[in-house]
């Protein structure tokens, strides 16, 4: 970290100048660098950059705002959630998850219905980080998504939120052909700590996939911890 205030200002001024560079790559790198500084007072500069003509630059500015965890920038990020670029919308979901404010939930609930699966996945991840039960209904719906990565993130998010309303659907996913889905479902069930799932987890030790069996053992360990507590 730069200790000399004069040098700090010099570097900041340089980055701000670079945000006006003719090259989108340079502007994007400048936005990224501003996020690394970690000073929340820089957020207004990055908010202005959300209107850059280059999607690459907008993505970098969004990611930087997520790093700063600036709640004041949330309204601007919500607006960016309507961007025409898939990667920009994905970055919005990730940034909102990093900030972790429940104010962002309404926007994330819209993003889980996005036409792009990467956006839906990132929105599910973000909802898991925020951990509000308001998201449960939408996440349960995502367990039926056509994309396996989205289903994985939805199951993982439900485990983080810790609602037993997810148990019936998670149990169904233990029979899913995709081993990764069976694995994350077992992990999520273990996080819920309901002892009634113990027989199911024991049966899962007969799964053909070693990682699924490993996750079943891990989940059983988590349930056992709940019982001891």
Predicted regions and their residues:
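Eukaryotic tandem repeat interaction scaffolds
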Residues: 121-125, 148-159, 170-173, 179-187
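A generic tandem-repeat structural signature
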Residues: 54-98, 114-125
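Core register positions within helices of long alpha-helical scaffolds
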Residues: 2, 33-36, 64, 95-98, ...
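Short inter-helical turns and helix N-cap capping residues of alpha-solenoid HEAT/ARM repeat scaffolds
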Residues: 22-23, 53-54, 84-85, 115-116, ...
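Amphipathic alpha-helical scaffolding segments comprising HEAT/armadillo-like alpha-solenoid repeats
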Residues: 5-18, 39-51, 70-82, 101-113, ...
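Eukaryotic acidic, serine/proline-rich intrinsically disordered low-complexity regions
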Residues: 1-8, 25
């Amino acid at each position: 970290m730069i200790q000399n205030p004069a040098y700090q200002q010099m570097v900041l001024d340089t980055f701000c100048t670079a945000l006006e560079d003719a090259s989108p790559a340079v502007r994007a790198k400048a936005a990224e660098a501003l996020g690394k500084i970690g000073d929340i007072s820089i957020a207004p500069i990055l908010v202005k950059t959300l209107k850059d003509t280059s999607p690459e630059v907008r993505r970098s500015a969004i990611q930087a705002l997520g790093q700063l965890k600036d709640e004041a920038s949330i309204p601007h990020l919500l607006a960016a959630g309507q961007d025409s670029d898939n990667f920009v919308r994905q970055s919005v979901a990730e940034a909102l998850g990093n900030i972790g404010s429940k104010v962002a939930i309404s926007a994330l609930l819209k993003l889980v219905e996005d036409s792009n699966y990467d956006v839906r996945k990132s929105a599910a991840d973000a909802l898991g980080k925020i951990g509000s039960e308001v998201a449960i209904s939408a996440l349960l719906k995502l367990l039926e998504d056509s994309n396996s990565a989205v289903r994985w993130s939805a199951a993982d998010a439900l485990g983080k939120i810790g609602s037993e309303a997810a148990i019936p659907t998670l149990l169904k996913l233990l029979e899913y052909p995709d081993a990764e889905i069976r694995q994350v479902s077992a992990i999520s069930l273990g996080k819920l700590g309901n002892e009634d799932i113990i027989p199911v987890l024991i049966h899962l030790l007969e799964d053909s996939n070693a990682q699924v069996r490993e996750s079943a053992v891990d989940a059983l360990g988590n349930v056992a911890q709940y019982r001891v507590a």
